[in-house]
Amino acid sequence: MDYRINNEAVAACVAAQLVRNGCKSLSTVVGLTNLLMHEKERKRLLSTDNEKELSTIIGQLDGGLLTIIMNSLVLMIQGGCMTFEEGDLSLTQFGISMCEQMKDRRSKMLSNILRDMPAIMEKTVRMKENMFDQRYVIAL
């Protein structure tokens, strides 16, 4: 647990920023949030450009945070920050406002994740678009 912010709050913030930055698919948001919240794998991913290594890192992720991530997304949807329609997530005006106010640097974990997010997104976009859809089958 991080200073003043727990893992569910971090997951909610990370997922909201991913949606804000163009990730719409539920599977992709869940997969990238899971990847970003695992510090060791995030650092490994940042240090490589080998596509096979990228696939290996993603394949080795455990699902320990998936319940937390899904709970966070449900709370964000129920709280009016996000909407979920036809398998895609989108931010409401309240969610956009929340993302713009995520400047509080008291959470080192969240700061590090948000700092690494653009590079991770760029590396994973180069891979197959459906890599998380194959890894995380989410039945609704």
What are these regions (language model features)?
Residues 103-140:
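Exposed, interaction-prone assembly regions rather than primary DNA-binding/catalytic cores
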Residues 1-61:
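Short, amphipathic alpha-helical interface elements at domain boundaries
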Residues 74-88:
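A short, conserved structural fragment
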Residues 85-108:
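Accessory beta->alpha helical hairpin/"wing" motif in late/C-terminal subdomains of nucleic-acid enzymes
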Residues 51-57, 72, 115-117:
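Short alpha-helical linear motifs
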Residues 62-78:
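Short amphipathic alpha-helical interaction segments
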Residues 59, 63-67, 85, 89:
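Short, well-ordered coil↔helix boundary/capping segments
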